[in-house]
A protein has these predicted regions:
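N-terminal amphipathic/basic leader segments beginning at the initiator methionine
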Residues: 1-19
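Mg2+-dependent prenyl diphosphate-binding active-site environment of isoprenoid biosynthetic enzymes
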Residues: 22-280
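Generic N-terminal amphipathic, Lys/Arg-enriched alpha-helix
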Residues: 7-11, 26, 30, 289-291
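Terminal targeting/low-complexity segments that flank the catalytic cores of oxidoreductases
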Residues: 276-295
């Protein structure tokens, strides 16, 4: 069974449990709407890739970890789109949750998905209680304060922004969660996988900045030009387009070098290369192809 199939099945099972009667029908519908259709499911795919590279001896726990992580990510998107933050009308090519269901239901949807993430892990804790506790700890750390995605959103309310801390929390946190949780689900030390997650997260932040500057709303499936609109710091402003692409490639080259020794090390390196290709804007792909460690 492929990663995508495993991820979708685990998320579907969790959402179905949240829709068991009696439950408020509109909120139940909004939960399903918020997680589907799934985007690239990049974070849970990275989690499963790391778990597989480490042996994946508890696949059901890996599935649960992947679904929990994606629930947190989807919750962050729902909250990020709210009028009090980005006030975005669209997400993944369709109306954002607050536009489709109302602002109060969007708040509740995001909150419910956060709770659901930890419910998923507790339901599967009997598979390996020690690993499950580790998964919950990492997910909590990378969601809340002081370094998780909540902190990342909080930085946008500060008069003076620590750019590195902002990017590390806003985007990087869930990538760190992905690599560490993948290792923990397979019985390995998650701390060794921190640098890989940090580097992938940093690269994705640069890629997001590039997309925001280069593509329109129809191409992105969400509002474009948000960094300029909200006065947010970004890599394009700092480095320019080509400089930002080179910076992203250097980050990902370091990511490959940071992969801990494991049975699937070579496969993981190929995955990072594939992500680099996907993240590079189409116009520049031929120029910046064939990434190698240290470039």
């Amino acid at each position: 069974m492929g990663f995508k199939t495993r991820i979708e099945a685990a998320i579907s099972d969790a959402i179905n449990l949240g829709q068991t009667a009696p439950s408020p029908a509109k909120l139940a519908s909004a939960l399903h709407y918020a997680v589907s259709p799934g985007g690239a499911r990049i974070r849970p795919t990275i989690l499963m890739s790391v778990a597989t590279a480490c042996g994946d001896d508890r696949p059901e726990l890996t599935n649960a970890a992947a679904a929990a992580l994606e629930c947190i990510h989807c919750a962050s998107l729902v909250h990020d789109d709210l009028p009090c933050f980005d006030n975005a009308d669209t997400r993944r090519g369709k109306p954002s949750v607050h536009r489709a269901y109302s602002e109060p239901l969007a708040v509740l949807t995001g909150d419910s998905l956060i709770v659901m993430a930890f419910q998923i892990l507790t339901r599967h804790a009997s598979i390996d209680p020690q690993r499950a506790i580790g998964l919950m700890n990492i997910l909590a750390e990378q969601t809340g304060m002081p370094n998780g995605i909540c902190a990342g959103q909080g930085w946008e309310s500060e008069q003076k922004i620590d750019l590195r801390a902002y990017h590390r929390a806003k985007t990087g946190a869930l990538f760190v969660a992905a690599t560490q949780m993948g290792a923990i689900a397979a019985g390995q030390d998650g701390a060794q996988w921190d640098e890989l997650g940090s580097r992938i997260g940093e690269a994705f932040q640069v890629a997001d900045d590039l997309s925001d500057a280069l593509y329109n709303e129809a191409e992105l499936g969400k509002p474009a030009g948000q960094d300029d609109l909200h006065g947010r710091p970004n890599a394009v402003t700092e480095y320019g387009i080509e400089g930002a692409i080179s910076h992203m490639k250097n980050i990902l080259g370091g990511a490959i070098s940071s992969i801990p020794r494991c049975p699937g090390e070579a496969i993981l390196a190929k995955m990072v290369n594939a992500q680099a290709e996907m993240l590079t804007p189409v116009k520049w792909r031929s120029k910046y192809s064939n990434l190698h460690p240290g470039e």
